[in-house]
Amino acid sequence: MDAAAFVNSVISRPWQADGLHCWELTRLCQREVFGRDLPAVLVAPESLLAKVRLMRRRHDFEGWTVSNRPCHGAVCFLTRKGHGDADAACHSGTWLALDGPGALLHVDHPQGVAFESLAELKLRNWSEPSFHIPIR
């Protein structure tokens, strides 16, 4: 599916702990737009500590390379300001090079699915983005 069409098909959908949470949207975008399969997480962890522990497992996944800048199709991990460095990531999305330099397609509560620039994410207290390019 075309990236713009995918964004239009999911934008504003609500966040759901047992449905469309941030990792599930990331997986869905990677599969539908790029034909890549990423590991499943059936239910979003409730506590911040559990989310951080789960996201830390990304370092064990050999299916991607790390990029120092955003690029089309990269999985982006984020943390909240004050919660440590990128190793304490608790959120994910997919960077899509649409509308100029691009933006992150992600979903959180209570906002729902959004397509936001790094500046917009920073205003919403998301920080320390790290970009991982799936190679499989």
Question: Can you annotate each of these PLM segments?
Answer:
Residues 29-34, 49-57, 128:
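Short amphipathic alpha-helical patches
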Residues 36-41:
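Glycine-rich phosphate/pyrophosphate-binding loops
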Residues 14-34:
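Active-site nucleophilic cysteine motif
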Residues 8-12, 78-81:
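A broad detector of the eukaryotic-type serine/threonine protein kinase catalytic domain
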Residues 14, 19, 42, 59, ...:
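Solvent-exposed, flexible loop/coil residues
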Residues 1-11, 114-136:
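Non-catalytic ligand/cofactor/substrate-binding and regulatory segments of enzyme domains
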Residues 43-113:
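...with weaker cross-activation on analogous glycine-rich loops/strands in unrelated enzymes
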